[in-house]
């Protein structure tokens, strides 16, 4: 854990809709809006096996070029890279993060986010476009239907679990 006395910890309130999608209320004066590459401990990356970025576009100062530096370093050290995303905060596009996406092993956008980023509506076209950026496994969350997965071996839908009440 790194403590920066100049940053307030971000507080997020997560809201879950009936279809299981989540949205968050975030303090724009917290660390999520101020984190940058100087806060990344590259020595610790060398010790890990998986780098999981909770959300591309969540920290505006971790832009595409910055993520590309972090992800390429992680790949050089044999890490598996996973990344989720949120809707772009500053109008970013797929092309803004293209350099970083080529390093991602598992990418977890939801359908709405993926449609916005690709300009497509058809699940297959959305997943194919994301896959074309070099992502190894596109795992698109499709609400109550489950996940649409696209990789070099093809496509499959993993159905959502039924009868589970989230607490």
Q: Model regions: which residues?
A:
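A phosphate-binding catalytic loop at a beta-strand-loop-alpha-helix junction
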Residues: 167
